[in-house]
Amino acid sequence: FLFIGDGMGATHVAVTESYLSHKAGKLGGEQLQISQFPYYGTATTHSANRHITCSSAAGTAIACGEKANNGTVGINKDSVEIESVAYALKKDGYRIGIMSTVPINHATPASFYAHSFNRGNYYEISSQIPASGFDLFAGAGFLDHKDKAGDKEATDAYLEKNGYVVSYGIEEFKAESEGAEKVVFCQASNRNESADNYVSDGVEEEDATMAQMLELALDFLGDEQPFFIMGEGGAIDWAAHDNRTMSMVENVIDFDNAVKVAYKFYLEHPDET
Protein backbone atom coordinates (compact mmCIF):
# COMPACT_ATOMS: atom_id res chain seq x y z
CA PHE A 1 0.00 0.00 0.00
CA LEU A 2 1.05 3.58 -0.68
CA PHE A 3 -1.14 6.35 0.70
CA ILE A 4 -0.76 9.98 -0.32
CA GLY A 5 -2.58 12.78 1.46
CA ASP A 6 -2.45 15.38 -1.28
CA GLY A 7 -1.33 18.74 0.10
CA MET A 8 -1.48 17.32 3.61
CA GLY A 9 1.11 18.28 6.21
CA ALA A 10 1.59 18.18 9.95
CA THR A 11 -0.77 21.14 10.44
CA HIS A 12 -3.65 19.36 8.70
CA VAL A 13 -3.13 16.39 11.00
CA ALA A 14 -2.90 18.59 14.10
CA VAL A 15 -6.10 20.49 13.25
CA THR A 16 -7.96 17.24 12.61
CA GLU A 17 -6.78 15.71 15.87
CA SER A 18 -7.78 18.89 17.73
CA TYR A 19 -11.25 18.57 16.22
CA LEU A 20 -11.50 14.90 17.23
CA SER A 21 -10.35 15.74 20.77
CA HIS A 22 -12.90 18.55 21.07
CA LYS A 23 -15.63 16.25 19.73
CA ALA A 24 -14.67 13.70 22.42
CA GLY A 25 -14.80 16.38 25.12
CA LYS A 26 -11.05 16.36 25.66
CA LEU A 27 -8.38 19.03 25.58
CA GLY A 28 -6.23 16.76 23.44
CA GLY A 29 -5.00 13.23 23.07
CA GLU A 30 -7.13 11.93 20.20
CA GLN A 31 -4.90 10.53 17.45
CA LEU A 32 -5.45 9.52 13.88
CA GLN A 33 -4.24 6.09 12.79
CA ILE A 34 -1.47 7.72 10.79
CA SER A 35 -0.12 9.28 13.99
CA GLN A 36 0.12 5.94 15.78
CA PHE A 37 2.72 4.20 13.62
CA PRO A 38 6.16 3.71 15.22
CA TYR A 39 8.22 5.60 12.66
CA TYR A 40 8.00 9.05 11.09
CA GLY A 41 10.02 10.79 8.42
CA THR A 42 10.23 14.18 6.77
CA ALA A 43 11.37 15.18 3.32
CA THR A 44 11.99 18.30 1.29
CA THR A 45 9.14 18.81 -1.14
CA HIS A 46 10.47 21.37 -3.59
CA SER A 47 10.17 20.37 -7.24
CA ALA A 48 12.99 20.43 -9.78
CA ASN A 49 12.19 24.00 -10.83
CA ARG A 50 10.15 25.59 -8.02
CA HIS A 51 10.48 26.11 -4.27
CA ILE A 52 6.83 25.10 -3.94
CA THR A 53 5.89 21.88 -5.69
CA CYS A 54 2.61 20.99 -7.36
CA SER A 55 0.75 17.69 -7.20
CA SER A 56 2.06 16.42 -10.53
CA ALA A 57 5.72 17.09 -9.71
CA ALA A 58 5.30 15.67 -6.21
CA GLY A 59 3.34 12.70 -7.52
CA THR A 60 6.02 12.00 -10.11
CA ALA A 61 8.75 12.19 -7.46
CA ILE A 62 6.91 9.71 -5.24
CA ALA A 63 5.84 7.41 -8.07
CA CYS A 64 9.04 7.46 -10.12
CA GLY A 65 11.79 8.41 -7.69
CA GLU A 66 12.97 11.55 -9.49
CA LYS A 67 12.17 15.21 -8.94
CA ALA A 68 10.25 16.75 -11.81
CA ASN A 69 9.22 20.19 -13.03
CA ASN A 70 5.91 21.62 -11.90
CA GLY A 71 3.09 20.77 -14.25
CA THR A 72 4.64 17.62 -15.72
CA VAL A 73 3.46 14.06 -15.19
CA GLY A 74 5.78 11.05 -15.33
CA ILE A 75 8.55 13.09 -16.98
CA ASN A 76 11.82 14.07 -15.31
CA LYS A 77 13.55 17.46 -15.35
CA ASP A 78 15.43 16.44 -18.50
CA SER A 79 12.13 15.86 -20.36
CA VAL A 80 12.57 12.08 -20.34
CA GLU A 81 9.61 9.79 -19.63
CA ILE A 82 10.25 7.78 -16.47
CA GLU A 83 8.67 4.60 -15.16
CA SER A 84 6.64 4.50 -11.97
CA VAL A 85 6.91 1.91 -9.23
CA ALA A 86 3.50 0.64 -10.35
CA TYR A 87 4.89 -0.28 -13.78
CA ALA A 88 7.90 -1.98 -12.21
CA LEU A 89 5.68 -4.05 -9.94
CA LYS A 90 3.33 -4.90 -12.81
CA LYS A 91 6.30 -6.40 -14.65
CA ASP A 92 7.01 -8.50 -11.55
CA GLY A 93 3.53 -10.01 -11.61
CA TYR A 94 1.72 -7.71 -9.21
CA ARG A 95 -1.87 -6.66 -9.74
CA ILE A 96 -2.13 -2.87 -9.65
CA GLY A 97 -4.81 -0.60 -8.22
CA ILE A 98 -4.78 3.21 -8.54
CA MET A 99 -7.43 5.08 -6.55
CA SER A 100 -8.21 8.63 -5.50
CA THR A 101 -10.99 10.68 -3.97
CA VAL A 102 -10.70 13.10 -6.92
CA PRO A 103 -10.84 12.36 -10.66
CA ILE A 104 -8.73 9.45 -11.87
CA ASN A 105 -6.90 11.58 -14.44
CA HIS A 106 -5.89 14.22 -11.89
CA ALA A 107 -2.21 14.91 -11.19
CA THR A 108 -1.33 12.46 -8.42
CA PRO A 109 -2.96 9.27 -9.74
CA ALA A 110 -1.83 10.19 -13.27
CA SER A 111 1.78 10.20 -12.10
CA PHE A 112 1.58 6.43 -11.64
CA TYR A 113 0.36 5.54 -15.14
CA ALA A 114 0.76 8.47 -17.55
CA HIS A 115 3.32 10.75 -19.18
CA SER A 116 2.47 14.34 -20.11
CA PHE A 117 4.19 17.72 -20.24
CA ASN A 118 0.93 19.31 -19.09
CA ARG A 119 -1.02 17.93 -16.15
CA GLY A 120 -4.08 19.70 -17.55
CA ASN A 121 -4.25 17.47 -20.63
CA TYR A 122 -6.84 15.36 -18.87
CA TYR A 123 -8.25 13.52 -21.88
CA GLU A 124 -4.79 12.63 -23.15
CA ILE A 125 -3.83 11.39 -19.69
CA SER A 126 -6.87 9.15 -19.25
CA SER A 127 -6.33 7.79 -22.77
CA GLN A 128 -3.09 6.26 -21.50
CA ILE A 129 -4.88 3.98 -19.05
CA PRO A 130 -5.23 0.99 -21.43
CA ALA A 131 -1.51 1.03 -22.25
CA SER A 132 -0.72 0.69 -18.55
CA GLY A 133 -2.54 -2.61 -18.29
CA PHE A 134 -3.25 -1.84 -14.64
CA ASP A 135 -6.04 -3.87 -13.14
CA LEU A 136 -8.12 -1.35 -11.22
CA PHE A 137 -8.71 2.39 -11.27
CA ALA A 138 -11.09 4.05 -8.82
CA GLY A 139 -12.06 7.64 -8.19
CA ALA A 140 -14.42 10.50 -8.91
CA GLY A 141 -14.76 9.92 -12.63
CA PHE A 142 -12.74 11.90 -15.14
CA LEU A 143 -12.09 15.54 -15.91
CA ASP A 144 -12.57 16.50 -19.59
CA HIS A 145 -14.62 13.42 -20.40
CA LYS A 146 -14.09 14.26 -24.08
CA ASP A 147 -11.10 15.73 -25.90
CA LYS A 148 -10.88 19.51 -26.33
CA ALA A 149 -11.78 19.34 -30.02
CA GLY A 150 -14.81 17.22 -29.19
CA ASP A 151 -14.21 14.78 -32.02
CA LYS A 152 -13.10 11.73 -30.02
CA GLU A 153 -15.19 9.26 -28.05
CA ALA A 154 -15.90 9.78 -24.37
CA THR A 155 -13.39 8.42 -21.90
CA ASP A 156 -15.62 5.68 -20.50
CA ALA A 157 -16.48 4.42 -23.99
CA TYR A 158 -12.80 4.47 -24.97
CA LEU A 159 -11.83 2.49 -21.89
CA GLU A 160 -14.59 -0.06 -22.41
CA LYS A 161 -13.50 -0.53 -26.02
CA ASN A 162 -10.01 -1.23 -24.71
CA GLY A 163 -10.86 -3.94 -22.22
CA TYR A 164 -12.03 -2.15 -19.07
CA VAL A 165 -15.38 -2.58 -17.36
CA VAL A 166 -16.47 0.92 -16.30
CA SER A 167 -18.98 1.10 -13.46
CA TYR A 168 -20.65 3.89 -11.51
CA GLY A 169 -21.34 3.43 -7.82
CA ILE A 170 -20.80 0.61 -5.36
CA GLU A 171 -23.68 -1.67 -6.34
CA GLU A 172 -22.97 -1.41 -10.06
CA PHE A 173 -19.30 -2.14 -9.42
CA LYS A 174 -20.10 -5.23 -7.38
CA ALA A 175 -22.41 -6.52 -10.10
CA GLU A 176 -20.21 -5.75 -13.09
CA SER A 177 -16.73 -6.47 -11.72
CA GLU A 178 -17.50 -10.13 -11.11
CA GLY A 179 -15.32 -12.07 -13.53
CA ALA A 180 -13.84 -8.92 -15.09
CA GLU A 181 -10.11 -8.69 -15.71
CA LYS A 182 -9.75 -4.91 -15.56
CA VAL A 183 -12.14 -2.42 -14.00
CA VAL A 184 -12.74 1.28 -13.47
CA PHE A 185 -14.84 2.42 -10.51
CA CYS A 186 -16.36 5.90 -10.72
CA GLN A 187 -18.42 7.60 -8.05
CA ALA A 188 -22.08 7.40 -8.97
CA SER A 189 -22.53 11.15 -8.87
CA ASN A 190 -19.03 12.13 -10.07
CA ARG A 191 -19.43 15.04 -7.70
CA ASN A 192 -15.72 15.88 -7.60
CA GLU A 193 -15.59 16.98 -11.22
CA SER A 194 -15.91 20.41 -9.59
CA ALA A 195 -13.76 21.53 -6.68
CA ASP A 196 -16.87 23.16 -5.16
CA ASN A 197 -18.22 19.86 -3.84
CA TYR A 198 -17.08 18.43 -0.52
CA VAL A 199 -18.31 16.12 2.19
CA SER A 200 -19.89 18.88 4.27
CA ASP A 201 -21.77 20.17 1.21
CA GLY A 202 -23.89 17.02 1.28
CA VAL A 203 -22.92 13.60 0.01
CA GLU A 204 -25.27 11.36 -1.88
CA GLU A 205 -25.61 7.98 -0.23
CA GLU A 206 -24.39 6.21 -3.35
CA ASP A 207 -20.93 7.79 -3.23
CA ALA A 208 -18.23 5.65 -1.67
CA THR A 209 -15.88 6.80 1.05
CA MET A 210 -12.18 6.23 0.52
CA ALA A 211 -12.33 3.28 2.92
CA GLN A 212 -15.18 1.74 0.92
CA MET A 213 -13.24 2.20 -2.31
CA LEU A 214 -10.27 0.44 -0.77
CA GLU A 215 -12.46 -2.45 0.39
CA LEU A 216 -13.82 -2.79 -3.16
CA ALA A 217 -10.26 -2.77 -4.49
CA LEU A 218 -9.15 -5.45 -2.04
CA ASP A 219 -12.11 -7.66 -2.92
CA PHE A 220 -11.42 -7.27 -6.63
CA LEU A 221 -7.65 -7.73 -6.56
CA GLY A 222 -7.99 -10.79 -4.34
CA ASP A 223 -5.24 -12.78 -2.71
CA GLU A 224 -4.03 -15.11 -5.46
CA GLN A 225 -1.36 -12.68 -6.68
CA PRO A 226 0.60 -9.97 -4.91
CA PHE A 227 -0.86 -6.51 -5.40
CA PHE A 228 0.04 -2.84 -5.06
CA ILE A 229 -2.53 -0.14 -4.30
CA MET A 230 -1.89 3.60 -4.39
CA GLY A 231 -4.60 5.51 -2.56
CA GLU A 232 -4.77 9.29 -2.71
CA GLY A 233 -6.80 11.55 -0.45
CA GLY A 234 -6.96 14.19 -3.16
CA ALA A 235 -9.87 16.18 -1.79
CA ILE A 236 -7.79 17.17 1.26
CA ASP A 237 -5.85 19.54 -0.97
CA TRP A 238 -8.92 20.79 -2.81
CA ALA A 239 -10.60 21.75 0.46
CA ALA A 240 -7.45 23.42 1.78
CA HIS A 241 -7.08 25.48 -1.41
CA ASP A 242 -10.57 26.86 -0.83
CA ASN A 243 -9.91 27.48 2.89
CA ARG A 244 -12.70 25.09 3.84
CA THR A 245 -11.38 23.92 7.18
CA MET A 246 -14.23 21.57 8.09
CA SER A 247 -14.17 19.94 4.66
CA MET A 248 -10.42 19.50 4.98
CA VAL A 249 -10.86 17.86 8.39
CA GLU A 250 -13.54 15.52 7.07
CA ASN A 251 -11.34 14.49 4.17
CA VAL A 252 -8.35 13.84 6.45
CA ILE A 253 -10.62 11.59 8.54
CA ASP A 254 -11.83 9.86 5.36
CA PHE A 255 -8.19 9.30 4.35
CA ASP A 256 -7.30 7.98 7.79
CA ASN A 257 -10.22 5.56 7.74
CA ALA A 258 -8.82 4.08 4.53
CA VAL A 259 -5.44 3.70 6.21
CA LYS A 260 -7.23 1.81 9.00
CA VAL A 261 -8.59 -0.66 6.42
CA ALA A 262 -5.09 -1.21 5.06
CA TYR A 263 -3.65 -1.57 8.56
CA LYS A 264 -6.30 -4.17 9.42
CA PHE A 265 -5.29 -6.04 6.26
CA TYR A 266 -1.67 -5.88 7.39
CA LEU A 267 -2.53 -7.30 10.82
CA GLU A 268 -4.27 -10.20 9.09
CA HIS A 269 -1.42 -10.71 6.59
CA PRO A 270 1.74 -9.52 8.37
CA ASP A 271 4.17 -11.63 6.37
CA GLU A 272 2.88 -10.56 2.96
CA THR A 273 2.22 -6.86 3.56
Feature-to-residue mapping (PLM):
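N-terminal catalytic scaffold of extracellular/periplasmic and nuclease hydrolases
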Residues: 1-148, 153-177, 181
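Beta-strand elements within well-structured catalytic alpha/beta cores of enzymes
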Residues: 1-8, 89, 186, 227-234, ...
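Metal-dependent active-site segment of extracytoplasmic phospho-/sulfohydrolases and closely related
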Residues: 10, 254-273
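Phosphate/oxyanion-binding active-site loops and adjacent basic polyanion-contact surfaces
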Residues: 118, 206-214, 251-255
